[in-house]
Amino acid sequence: MIGKLSGKVDSQGDDYVIIDVNGVGYLVYASDKTLGTLAEGEFYKLFIETHVREEHMHLYGFLTLEEKIFFNLLQSVNGIGTRMALFILSSLTPSDIQIAVNNEDKNIFKAISGVGAKLAERIVLELKGKVAKISSGSAIIKESLNIKNITPVASNEVIKALVNLGFSRFEAQNAVQGIITQNPEISIDELIKTALKNRNSNF
């Protein structure tokens, strides 16, 4: 499964971009907001969600981990598929969705073309607990360290990734906190690499 692509934008369509990675062109579906950010010939890194359906494999690309997380989160709502999830992310940022759900603001979603009153209500009801859960794992780290470039959702994603790589949750949280304390401007990729390197050096 493809999790990330790094390459140059070859061309774009109405709902997709072709990323050239070492001469191989990958067709990646993306939100209007993401497509509007990409420039032909420029180099980008996209976080990829891979969907395999019978004989077809579709790739969905995102500039941030938060967008990828919320793309999957939106699809957990009854009645929302990949197209609608991308459509919502074309209108709202992950932060917008988070705030709207926490405030039970259905009108934010109803304002999006194609989202009716019933679907807007389901989004708020079905995501209420899930959004809170995503936020809680990293909110303390965010607040205590005054992190500028790593959001709560991204911090929590790093912690979950480290747990999947063999860390206990306590070890992962301490690793993230320690590394960001020393380098608040560190990127997510470097944060994970540093955590793994530090752990291996302790064995």
From Swiss-Prot:
The UniProt annotation puts the region (Domain II) at: 64-142
Q: Which GO cellular component does the record give, naming just one?
A: Holliday junction helicase complex
Gene Ontology BP annotations: DNA recombination; DNA repair
- What domain of life does the UniProt record list for this protein's source? Bacteria
Which Pfam family is one of those matched by this entry?
A: HHH_5
| Residue ranges, annotated region (Domain I) | 1-63
Among InterPro entries, the record links this protein to:
DNA_helicase_Holl-junc_RuvA_I, NA-bd_OB-fold, RuvA, RuvA_2-like, RuvA_C, RuvA_C_sf
Q: Which GO terms describe its molecular function?
A: ATP binding; four-way junction DNA binding; four-way junction helicase activity
UniProt keywords (A-Z) are: Cytoplasm, DNA damage, DNA recombination, DNA repair, DNA-binding
Q: Where is this region: Domain III?
A: 150-203
List where in the cell it is found.
Cytoplasm
The main place the protein resides is: cytoplasm
* Region (Flexible linker) residue spans: 143-149
Q: What does this protein do?
A: The RuvA-RuvB-RuvC complex processes Holliday junction (HJ) DNA during genetic recombination and DNA repair, while the RuvA-RuvB complex plays an important role in the rescue of blocked DNA replication forks via replication fork reversal (RFR). RuvA specifically binds to HJ cruciform DNA, conferring on it an open structure. The RuvB hexamer acts as an ATP-dependent pump, pulling dsDNA into and through the RuvAB complex. HJ branch migration allows RuvC to scan DNA until it finds its consensus sequence, where it cleaves and resolves the cruciform DNA.
Q: How does it assemble?
A: Homotetramer. Forms an RuvA(8)-RuvB(12)-Holliday junction (HJ) complex. HJ DNA is sandwiched between 2 RuvA tetramers; dsDNA enters through RuvA and exits via RuvB. An RuvB hexamer assembles on each DNA strand where it exits the tetramer. Each RuvB hexamer is contacted by two RuvA subunits (via domain III) on 2 adjacent RuvB subunits; this complex drives branch migration. In the full resolvosome a probable DNA-RuvA(4)-RuvB(12)-RuvC(2) complex forms which resolves the HJ.
Family (UniProt): Belongs to the RuvA family.
Question: What does the domain comment read?
Answer: Has three domains with a flexible linker between the domains II and III and assumes an 'L' shape. Domain III is highly mobile and contacts RuvB.
Instruction: Tell me the protein's name.
Output: Holliday junction branch migration complex subunit RuvA
